[in-house]
């Protein structure tokens, strides 16, 4: 069953004819994703990668029946692209763009309330259900269909968890990169809730990092959830000094909050198995499942 996307998901690309949109759409098509068109204002009526181009998301949705969109649009214009997709009623919107102004994302968060749209990202690698649907920039070949749900704030650490769970023979049900910005569309709790309710997902890997309280909120949710599944977590930034931003805009220990130790403590108290090395994620999960 997986979560959010599958082989029936119809995907359009906003920023379709740009270099990033072109490259990653080619990769998605080669993977088997059901790409049905793209949006580039002013180029409607033409074709690109043998798919139709539309001027607006409304038009693309009406003509193709798309229920998902991936956004490869520069930071100054990305929020408007998300808002257009929300307005068109696209169900899954994946925004890859890094560097969207925080106030722009606050506007987007407000527009999401009461809408039918779920936003993944921004500043994320995207979402993939192996062998079915790849939306984003992750390397498809490292994924294998399996039973581990992966949710992560970090792109490259997601790939590390994927490669390791593939190597030990577990595979993945769905992998979601929620992004490293302070304001995003989908959080750990949203994804863990879906994974807990998904029959195909037998266990969960959660990769967090310093900054914010998303991991603490997830720990609280896990602790009080009636459904229980094995969960392994790694938190990046254990050695990070307070006040220093570590890569992502949201990865900063500020006001004495958001340290790795706080997060690890909260997760451990919720019954989550912790690994302190990213190299041990797959092995830790395999050992946990083999009991």
Curated annotation (Swiss-Prot):
Keywords: Ligase, Nucleotide-binding, Tricarboxylic acid cycle. It catalyses: succinate + ATP + CoA = succinyl-CoA + ADP + phosphate; GTP + succinate + CoA = succinyl-CoA + GDP + phosphate. The active site is at 248 (tele-phosphohistidine intermediate). Pathway: Carbohydrate metabolism; tricarboxylic acid cycle; succinate from succinyl-CoA (ligase route): step 1/1. One of its GO terms (cellular component) is succinate-CoA ligase complex (ADP-forming). PANTHER family: SUCCINATE--COA LIGASE [ADP_GDP-FORMING] SUBUNIT ALPHA, MITOCHONDRIAL, SUCCINYL-COA LIGASE SUBUNIT ALPHA. Heterotetramer of two alpha and two beta subunits. This is Succinate--CoA ligase [ADP-forming] subunit alpha. It comes from Rickettsia bellii (strain RML369-C).
